[in-house]
Curated annotation (Swiss-Prot):
Listed name of the protein: Glucose-6-phosphate isomerase
PROSITE patterns: P_GLUCOSE_ISOMERASE_1, P_GLUCOSE_ISOMERASE_2, P_GLUCOSE_ISOMERASE_3
Cellular localisation: Cytoplasm
SUPFAM superfamilies: SIS domain
Function comment: Catalyzes the reversible isomerization of glucose-6-phosphate to fructose-6-phosphate.
Organism from which the protein derives: Vibrio atlanticus (strain LGP32)
Enzyme Commission numbers on file: 5.3.1.9
Gene Ontology terms, MF aspect: carbohydrate derivative binding; glucose-6-phosphate isomerase activity; monosaccharide binding
Lineage, highest ranks first: Bacteria, Pseudomonadati, Pseudomonadota, Gammaproteobacteria, Vibrionales
């Protein structure tokens, strides 16, 4: 079980607070000038294919020493052991947290309540493999005898974000199937997705553990109505729908053959579920062998995380640097910036992964915390972001630590595109770290023939202060295994930060109140009667909505 340790009461936190007083004056130019081996000292490799360079941060050896001490004092090691050991560390829901078991590629048992879960995990994987083969090979036929050509995954949150992110990131590995994802209860999403599709060749995956999720089931029923408008006979539903669920009764009532129901367990959190049956869309998209490679990659990072000393432990290092900025420098957000167009949903995926996990205001004893917890996560692929929001990162008043991620080898080596992309990748972190001084700007202007008056007027706007922190994560190539490495790396980073902040990272009660109120409001929208049961603003909005749609 996780211990209740207020990080601000630790000796390491107090030492970091004192250290920060002098560290505020750190200058990256000086840090690099003073240490010719700074890159070697503050970078590490994962295997032979991933390099993590954290040298362009406002840290020195003393900073890291205090941060590692903080990890020790908050008992991160015992927390890691508790998670991998199947302890019910999701205390508010009384559940173990074992997404790591889903990608356990060893022969080691994983125990929950005295029972090894691995036989069940491997049975579902075997079922997914067979199903994937039947669909991709064309053996599975629709109700008119045609092969499936399109797969629509209907889910929301973890049942959508993860599979969508991975299938996009691994597009170069796709099978012949066309993948589609529907999540929003806005009817536009399902209607526009279905417009070009043929009911005879479309398979739907309904991803809902309980088979009661409002958004998912609303979309699933609309998909079934669309299908039956063409197919007619409800018996045909079984050839075109499968379920990722544990509610066999509701699945059968919907018309799905329970032989095509793929289960997962309550120790699998939604935002960590792509490794489970929820990943069936991934398996169909890239083939089961590649899905297994994705699991292998995550398992490699799990082993690294569980067994490596903190000083060389990549998720721990990244987590601690994040704590340094969040709790001492006052940074409120972090950017994730993949220089790979296929990874265009990577930041959005970890926006959920991080903000739903660590967006908490009470500690593990239920008391309000007096320090900052999870940051805001955002980002877009490079180079698009450079022409959108990098201005603020470079010259704004907010400190925004940023992760730059890029592959050395492109899947599309057209002309010199990748060299140009990577030149921007390297240039941005250099510019953020070292900036451009007033003197350099003046010299450039004078060399360009500007007058003294022009120089004096324009120089302040051209100065880059630098000292903007970044991590650079260089990957040989984005493939199923390396993507598995990266996803697990960020998952474990988030976990470590939650341990240090003394919060529960695996529940998400913050999503409940809005759903509860929506269920109360829904019947009130059924007629034109004036609503008076809420506050004046909500009443006014509902009544204005009714008037506008009349």
């Amino acid at each position: 079980m996780l211990k209740n340790i207020n990080p601000t009461q630790t000796q390491a936190w107090k030492a970091l607070t004192a250290h920060f007083e002098s560290a505020q004056d750190m200058d990256m130019k000086e840090l690099f000038a003073q240490d010719a081996k700074r890159f070697e000292s503050f970078s590490t490799r994962f295997g032979s294919d991933i390099l993590v360079d954290y040298s362009k941060n406002l840290i020195d050896a003393e900073t890291m020493q205090h941060l590692f001490a903080l990890a020790n004092e908050t008992e991160v090691k015992s927390a890691i052991e508790a998670m991998f050991g199947g302890d019910a560390i999701n205390k508010t829901e009384g559940r173990s947290v074992l997404h790591t078991a889903l990608r356990n590629r060893s022969d080691k048992p994983v125990m929950v309540d005295g029972k090894d879960v691995m036989p069940a995990v491997n049975a579902v994987l075997a079922k997914m493999e067979l199903f994937t083969h039947r669909i991709v090979s064309g053996e599975w036929k629709g109700y008119t005898g045609k092969e499936i050509t399109d797969v629509v995954n209907i889910g929301i949150g973890g049942s959508d974000l993860g599979p969508y992110m991975v299938t996009e990131a691994l597009t170069p590995y796709k099978t012949r199937l066309n993948m589609h994802f529907v999540s929003n209860v806005d009817g536009t999403h399902i209607v526009e997705t279905l417009k070009p599709l043929n009911p005879e060749t479309t398979l739907f995956l309904v991803a809902s553990k309980t088979f009661t999720t409002q958004e998912t089931m609303t979309n699933a029923h609309s998909a079934r109505d669309w299908f039956l408008a063409e197919a007619g006979d409800s018996a045909h539903v079984a050839k075109h729908f499968a379920a990722l669920s544990t509610n066999a009764a509701s699945v059968a009532e919907f018309g799905i053959d329970t032989d095509n129901m793929f289960e997962f367990w309550d120790w699998v959190g939604g935002r960590y579920s792509l490794w489970s049956a929820i990943g069936l869309s991934i398996s169909l998209s890239i083939g089961f062998d590649n899905f297994a490679e994705l699991l292998d990659g995550a398992h490699e990072m799990d082993n690294h995380f569980a067994s490596t000393e903190f000083e060389s432990n990549i998720p721990v290092i990244l987590a601690l640097i994040g704590v340094w900025y969040n709790n001492f420098h006052g940074a409120e957000s972090e950017a994730i910036l993949p220089y790979d167009q296929y990874m265009h949903r990577f930041a959005a995926y970890f926006q959920q992964g991080n903000m739903e996990s660590n967006g908490k205001f009470v500690d593990r004893e239920g008391n309000p915390v007096e320090y900052q917890t999870g940051p805001i996560i955002w980002g877009e692929p490079g180079t698009n972001g450079q022409h959108a929001f990098y201005q603020l990162i470079h010259q704004g008043t907010k400190l925004i630590p940023s992760d730059f991620i890029a592959p050395a080898i492109s899947h599309n080596p057209a002309s010199d595109h990748h060299q140009k992309l990577m030149s921007n990748f390297f240039a941005q972190t250099e510019a953020l770290a070292f900036g451009k001084t007033k003197e350099t700007v003046e010299a450039e202007f004078l060399a360009a023939g500007k007058t003294a008056e022009e120089v004096a007027e324009l120089v302040p706007f051209k100065v880059f202060e630098g000292n903007r922190p970044t991590n650079s994560i260089l990957v040989k190539q984005i493939n199923p295994r390396s993507l598995g490495n990266l996803i697990a790396m960020y998952e474990h980073k988030i976990f470590v930060q939650g341990v240090i902040w003394n919060i529960f990272s695996f529940d998400q009660w913050g999503v409940e109140l809005g759903k509860q109120l929506a269920n109360q409001i829904l019947p009130e929208l059924a007629d034109d009667a004036q609503v008076t049961s809420h506050d004046s603003s909500t009443n006014g909005l509902i009544n204005a909505f009714k008037a506008l749609k009349a």
